[in-house]
């Protein structure tokens, strides 16, 4: 039984001057998305020839849950709600094939600067391990400026960082931490250049150290001196002369530690 051989689908180049092509039809929006410099660009790696994701993962902040929203600190609740609404508007524009609404980022930026300004000058009665991260993220967002964003990829990422800043306020009780794991890890590693994000139990670690230091202020100097002594003996280097009364000096790899 003979089968009709379908005609090959028409193909168009992805970007002028490149041999790669895609089929017309349902994939046409992806061609628009992947066009470098287009407002519909959804993949930050298009410049290097990475595959376009089609926008499926953009604007995750538009799907926040009521349970998560009420768990946020009251100081950020209004801004988090606005970010959720702006993300939904931008996602709707993406579905309609329109570029990112130009008014969204200037509005989000203005609201964030007001909120972060109050946060930055407010006293911190108790140290929280997420505070340095919040300040780093906040300063980065402030430095971006209020100019409208040209691509959906960049707008989605900025709104995600805004939501991440809010969620750092309940860093150890956030129910949507998985939303930040991939993108915000890249943020710390690439955009700020400060390495991997701290482990979730970092606060417990530092609290324990502070408690130990408070109970015995000489504990860590004694341990440091002992560690330096053992390290020096392990290298079979000559030990330094006994220090003068009232002070202790340990030489380690051409450096001196005074206690």
UniProtKB/Swiss-Prot annotation:
Post-translational modification: Phosphorylated.
Taxonomic classification: Viruses, Duplodnaviria, Heunggongvirae, Peploviricota, Herviviricetes
Annotated signal peptide: none
Organism per entry: Equine herpesvirus 4 (strain 1942)
Inducing stimuli: Expressed late in the infection cycle.
Subcellular location(s) per record: Virion tegument; Host nucleus matrix
Xref: InterPro entries: EHV_Unk (IPR000714)
A molecular function GO annotation: zinc ion binding
Protein name: Virion protein US10 homolog
UniProt keyword terms in alphabetical order: Host nucleus, Late protein, Metal-binding, Virion, Virion tegument, Zinc, Zinc-finger
Zinc finger (unnamed): 162-174
Any one cellular-component term (Gene Ontology): viral tegument
Chief localisation class: virion
Similarity comment text for this entry: Belongs to the herpesviridae US10 family.
Transmembrane segment boundaries: none
UniProt entry tagged with the keyword Nucleotide-binding: no
